[in-house]
Amino acid sequence: MNILRKIVKSCKDEEDQKPALVSAPPDDDDLWLPPPEYVPLTEITGKKNMRNFCVNGEIKICSPNGYSFRILRHILKSFDGVYSGNRRMIGLVKVVIGLALSGAPVPEGMNWVYKIRRTLVFQWAESRGPLDGEELEYSQEITWDDDSEFIGLQIRVSARQCHIQGRVWCINMNSRACQLWSDMSLKTQQSDEDKNTSLLLE
């Protein structure tokens, strides 16, 4: 029986591995940019529950025999049930996970590492989201382990409010990020004040 469970297993880099030949995507890589829902302050009509966050996210995948997004998606479909971080920021974490996994991984021994560092603008529905000035330091390992496959998913997300301005972003709505957000059941609703803006409900 396939069991999704939260356990701690170390995925250490192997020192005898050859140097990585794949580099990280450049900072301006469009694959890493958030969707139209998250736009700079100057483009947002309703600013009541808007927050600018400086975000650092890292997802490390440990799998001795490689991995497929089929298993990753299966793990993320249970994300609400295993998430151990601040519940007021679960929506932000889901967005960062989707964006990070849309980039290109950097191999580190037996691990594949996805990273994102961005200033993102979020809007939450009334009474939702983090408290003003609240910061997030979230770290968790979720492991899939059955008779045929092992995958360790190490997730780290840090987020703090900041005042750095951004630019208008867009992403293909059929992209991997949107697929992963759907898997994680990211909850949003269209803003009554701005038809181009979606509000996070979590």
Curated annotation (Swiss-Prot):
InterPro entries given in the database record: Rhabdo_M, Rhabdovirus_M_sf
Gene Ontology CC: one annotated term: viral envelope
Location in the cell: Virion membrane; Host endomembrane system
Domain remarks: Late-budding domains (L domains) are short sequence motifs essential for viral particle budding. They recruit proteins of the host ESCRT machinery (Endosomal Sorting Complex Required for Transport) or ESCRT-associated proteins. Matrix protein contains one L domain: a PPXY motif which potentially interacts with the WW domain 3 of NEDD4 E3 ubiquitin ligase (Potential).
Pfam family, one: Rhabdo_M2
Gene Ontology biological process terms from the UniProt entry: viral budding via host ESCRT complex
Name listed for the protein in its UniProt record: Matrix protein
Motif PPXY motif: chain residues: 35-38
Family: Belongs to the lyssavirus matrix protein family.
UniProt subunit comment: Homomultimer. Interacts with nucleoprotein and with the cytoplasmic domain of glycoprotein.
Record region (Essential for glycoprotein binding): 115-151
Organism listed in the record: Aravan virus (ARAV)
GO MF annotation list: structural constituent of virion
Additional note from the record: Most abundant protein in the virion.
TM stretches of this protein: none
Lineage: Viruses, Riboviria, Orthornavirae, Negarnaviricota, Haploviricotina
This protein's UniProt keywords: Host membrane, Host-virus interaction, Membrane, Phosphoprotein, Viral budding, Viral budding via the host ESCRT complexes, Viral envelope protein, Viral matrix protein, Viral release from host cell, Virion
The protein's role, per its UniProt record: Plays a major role in assembly and budding of virion. Completely covers the ribonucleoprotein coil and keep it in condensed bullet-shaped form. Inhibits viral transcription and stimulates replication. Plays a major role in early induction of TRAIL-mediated apoptosis in infected neurons.
Membrane topology: Peripheral membrane protein
